[in-house]
Amino acid sequence: MSWIRIRRSGVLLLALVLSGCINQQQQPQPAAPVEPVTPPVNVPQPPKAEPGQNVPPPPKMQPLNWSATVSPLVGQMLKADGINAGNVLLVDNVKNSTNGSLQSAKATAALLNSLENNGQFSLVTPQQLAAARQTLGLSADDSLVSRSKAIGLARYVGAQYVLYSNAEGDIKSPSLQLQLMLVQTGEIIWSGSGAVVH
């Protein structure tokens, strides 16, 4: 029994020694304030223009003769088979698919002038077209002109035909493509193209 008492005493002594080793919890030290360091920002200074140094002018738009370009094409179109006289025609804005800036509004105006008093079609007026574009949420200068949008616009204004036009190629020598489409089916009933006259 003495070994048991010694063993128990040893365990108790060990427990007392270990319990005396527990340190008091230390209070956390306040953190030292850290000041953020902002890296220096190097702003590049624009080069100063010296007096007398000229800025090059933007490239000039080449004058294009839209009337001379569209007249022969419109003449061919009016002689095409399958056109019923007296129907309403919507002339959509000329789409610019060239590699530069093109005065497509002048091209559209030349198409409208060439089709006035043609004897085949009644034209949708620019006012009707502008109102329809606004109602359908299309801007007047919609650069995403597509055949489906043109047909949808023609249906909205009650036209039976739509003239879709696209200027394409190099801006120095563009070509104009015209397509007369039947609104009801979307069928292209006439197509023609020609070089734009300078």
Swiss-Prot record:
Note the InterPro entries from the entry: LpoB
Q: Which GO terms describe its cellular component?
A: periplasmic side of cell outer membrane
**Record GO biological process:** peptidoglycan biosynthetic process; regulation of cell shape
Lipid moiety-binding residues (N-palmitoyl cysteine): 21
Q: Where is this region: Disordered?
A: 28-62
Q: Which GO terms describe its molecular function?
A: enzyme regulator activity
Subunit note: Interacts with PBP1b.
User: Member of which family?
Assistant: Belongs to the LpoB family.
Q: What is this protein called?
A: Penicillin-binding protein activator LpoB
